[in-house]
C-alpha cells in the first residue's frame, strides 16, 4: 500500500518573513514528518498483516507538475491516496484537474472554508480543521466565559479577512458580538499611527476581549499587555485555536509528541503535522478494517460511519458526508499550555457534538 505526498517547493506559507531581524514569526516546519510518525505505525501493523506501507514524496514548482506527477503515480505506482500540503487555490486546481482519476487527496494544511464550501471537491478529504471549526471553538469558549463583546483587530492580508469573516459567522451562531473591526498596518510610517499603535487601536470603546487576525504573526505578538483596557487577547495571538499543541497531555498525546520529537528534532508537532498524521492513520484503519487495498474499498470505508479515527484528543473522528471535513476536537492553547478543548460540554448537537464545530449539513454550500 503506497501513499503519496505532494507540496510546492516555493510555498509562500513557509517563507521566513522575519529573516532580516532573525525572528521567526510563524512555525515554518512542513507537515511531512507528521505523516512519517503514522507511517511507522502502519509499517508495524503491516509486518503482522503482510501489507507493506510506504510513501512517495514530491515537491514541485507548479500545480501542473504536481498534476503530472500524481497522474504518473496512479498509472505506474498504483498510488491512489495522496497527502497534499498546498495552499487553497493550488489544492482546488489540483482536485479539479484530477477529477476523472481514481484519486483521493488529503488536505493537511489549508483551513480555507471555501474548500469545504463552494470550491469543495469529491476527491478531497480534509484532516486539517476549517477556519469555521477554529473560530467556532474559540467563540464557544468566549461565550462560556461571558466575554461576549469582541473587539477585532484585522491585518491587511486576505487570510486575515477570512479569519474575521469566520469569526463574525461564529459570533452570530453563538450569540456573541463583534463591537468593531479596526484595521492595523505593519509599517513605521508615523502618518499611520492610528493603525499601528495598539493603545489607539484598542481605545475609545468598551469590550470584553480582543480578537487579533494576523496571519503574518508579526503584529499580534505585541498586542497582549498593550491593550488600552486590561482584556484577554485571542485569535492569532494569546489564546489560539489549533488542531494540535505540543502541550496537550491527555489521551496518549504525550507519547505521540515524544515520538514526533524523536523523529524530527528539534521541532515540536504542530496542527498541520497532526493533520498529516491523521490522514495516514485514517488510510491505515480503512485498509485494515475493510480488508482490502483496492481504491474503491478503502475510499468507501473512509467515507462511511464505520471509521472511528483515534484523534488523540478524546472524541473519535470521522469524515462529514456533506463536505468531507474530518470531525475532531479543537485545542485552545497559549504558547505553553492548552486551556480548553472544544467542543465544550455545554454545547450539544442532535447527532454528534463535534458537529457544533464548523459548517453543519443544513448550512453547507458544498455540492459534490
Listing of model-derived features with the role each one plays in the protein:
Residues 1-368:
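Extracytosolic ligand-binding ectodomains
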Amino acid at each position: 500500500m503506497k501513499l503519496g505526498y505532494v507540496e510546492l517547493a516555493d510555498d509562500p506559507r513557509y517563507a521566513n518573513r522575519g529573516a532580516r531581524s532573525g525572528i521567526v514569526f510563524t512555525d515554518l516546519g512542513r507537515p511531512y514528518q507528521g505523516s512519517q510518525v503514522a507511517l511507522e505505525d502502519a509499517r508495524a501493523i503491516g509486518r503482522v498483516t503482510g501489507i507493506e506501507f510506504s510513501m512517495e514524496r514530491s515537491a514541485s514548482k507548479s500545480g501542473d507538475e504536481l498534476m503530472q506527477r500524481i497522474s504518473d503515480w496512479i498509472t505506474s505506482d498504483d498510488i491512489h491516496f495522496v497527502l497534499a500540503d498546498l495552499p487553497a487555490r493550488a489544492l482546488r486546481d489540483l482536485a479539479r484537474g484530477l477529477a476523472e482519476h481514481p484519486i483521493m487527496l488529503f488536505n493537511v494544511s489549508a483551513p480555507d472554508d471555501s474548500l469545504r464550501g463552494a470550491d469543495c471537491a469529491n476527491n478531497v478529504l480534509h484532516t486539517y480543521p476549517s477556519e469555521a471549526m477554529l473560530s467556532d471553538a474559540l467563540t464557544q469558549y468566549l461565550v462560556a466565559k461571558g466575554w461576549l463583546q469582541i473587539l477585532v483587530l484585522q491585518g491587511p492580508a486576505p487570510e486575515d479577512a477570512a479569519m474575521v469573516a469566520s469569526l463574525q459567522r461564529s459570533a452570530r451562531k453563538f450569540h456573541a458580538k463583534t463591537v468593531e473591526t479596526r484595521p492595523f498596518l505593519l509599517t513605521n510610517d508615523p502618518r499611520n499611527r492610528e493603525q499601528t499603535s495598539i493603545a489607539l487601536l484598542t481605545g475609545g470603546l468598551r469590550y470584553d476581549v480582543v480578537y487579533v487576525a494576523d496571519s503574518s504573526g508579526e503584529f499580534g505578538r505585541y498586542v497582549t499587555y498593550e491593550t488600552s483596557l486590561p482584556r484577554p487577547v485571542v485569535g492569532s495571538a494569546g489564546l489560539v485555536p489549533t488542531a494540535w499543541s505540543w502541550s496537550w497531555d491527555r489521551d496518549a498525546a504525550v507519547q505521540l509528541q515524544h515520538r514526533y520529537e524523536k523523529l524530527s528534532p528539534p521541532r515540536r508537532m504542530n496542527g498541520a503535522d497532526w493533520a498529516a498524521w491523521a490522514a495516514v492513520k485514517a488510510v491505515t484503519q480503512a485498509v485494515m478494517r475493510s480488508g482490502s487495498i483496492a481504491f474503491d474499498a478503502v475510499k468507501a470505508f473512509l467515507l462511511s460511519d464505520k471509521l472511528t479515527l483515534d484523534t488523540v484528543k478524546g472524541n473519535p473522528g470521522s469524515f462529514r458526508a456533506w463536505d468531507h471535513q474530518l470531525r475532531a476536537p479543537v485545542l485552545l492553547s497559549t504558547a505553553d499550555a492548552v486551556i480548553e478543548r472544544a467542543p465544550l460540554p455545554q454545547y450539544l448537537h442532535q447527532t454528534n457534538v463535534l458537529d457544533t464545530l464548523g459548517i453543519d449539513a443544513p448550512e453547507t454550500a458544498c455540492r459534490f
